[in-house]
């Protein structure tokens, strides 16, 4: 896929599933589970040991399928360079460290955190593809609606943080282009327990909203 095709694919599939754990094997099993559930956009965070290896192995597993695999919690240049070893489809920086843009190739889709209108527009003009609004549940859907139906309709937004099942439709109606799902689905305790059937059930409950 081209970069633009990846952006369209991410928006079309709506949910970005985030795997955050300190267990490499658990992260890989979680990835397999999310794929089985029907997830199409999946992120490995830098908290996972050898997360660049996890990204590379995950991409190899699904190379014949339309599934995007990315790197998350990419806080600085060092982590960005490490992530590039896995050749991720996208990179997520939860803050505003524009230094990572110096080492992330232009063909990669980039998400970057923004909490205020000023931060959000700064991201846009820096060339960021999606602004990650976090914690979205605290700001609420009205915050996103005020921007998307107001001065910033051209900014693509990822709503993440506290995105429980019951509020998803409100955020989508408010204009959120993508919804980030981390501990709402791939809960650390479930990964540690090896309860991947529950993770699959949770993932499917969100994905069913797209049917």
Language model segments and positions:
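Generic hydrophobic/aromatic pocket-lining and core-packing "Φ" positions
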Residues: 31, 55, 80, 100-101, ...
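Conserved N-terminal beta1-alpha1 strand-loop-helix module at the mouth
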Residues: 1-87, 165, 173, 193-211
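Glycine-rich phosphate-binding active-site loops on the catalytic face of alpha/beta enzymes
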Residues: 90-100, 133-140, 176-196
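Histidine/lysine/aspartate-rich catalytic loop segments that bind and position anionic ligands
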Residues: 97-139
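Glycine-enriched alpha-helix->loop->beta-strand junction motifs that scaffold or abut catalytic
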Residues: 35-40, 62-64, 84-91, 106-111, ...
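Short secondary-structure capping/turn micro-motifs that flank functional sites
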Residues: 49-51, 78, 99-100, 119-121, ...
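Alpha/beta catalytic cores of nucleotide-metabolism and tRNA/nucleoside-modifying enzymes
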Residues: 1, 24-25, 115-121, 125, ...
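Glycine-rich beta-to-alpha transition loops that act as phosphate-gripper elements at the mouths
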Residues: 20-24, 71-77, 93-96, 112-117, ...
């Amino acid at each position: 896929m081209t970069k633009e095709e990846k952006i369209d694919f991410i928006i079309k599939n709506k949910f970005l599933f985030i795997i955050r754990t300190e267990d490499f094997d658990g992260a890989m099993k979680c990835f397999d589970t999310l794929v089985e559930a029907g997830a199409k956009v999946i992120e490995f965070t830098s908290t996972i040991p050898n997360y660049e290896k996890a990204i590379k192995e995950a991409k190899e597993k699904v190379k014949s399928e339309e599934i995007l695999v990315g790197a998350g919690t990419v806080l600085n240049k060092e982590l960005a360079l490490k992530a590039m070893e896995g050749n991720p489809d996208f990179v997520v920086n939860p803050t505003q460290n524009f230094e990572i843009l110096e080492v992330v190739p232009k063909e990669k889709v980039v998400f970057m955190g923004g909490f205020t209108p000023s931060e959000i527009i700064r991201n846009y003009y820096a060339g960021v593809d999606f602004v990650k609004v976090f914690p979205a549940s605290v700001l609420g859907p009205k915050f996103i609606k005020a921007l998307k139906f107001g001065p910033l309709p051209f900014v693509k937004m990822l709503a993440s943080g506290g995105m429980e099942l019951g509020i998803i439709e409100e955020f989508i109606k408010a204009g959120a282009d993508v919804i980030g799902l981390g501990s709402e689905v791939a809960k650390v305790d479930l990964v540690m327990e090896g309860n991947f059937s529950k993770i699959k059930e949770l993932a499917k409950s969100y994905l069913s909203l797209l049917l």
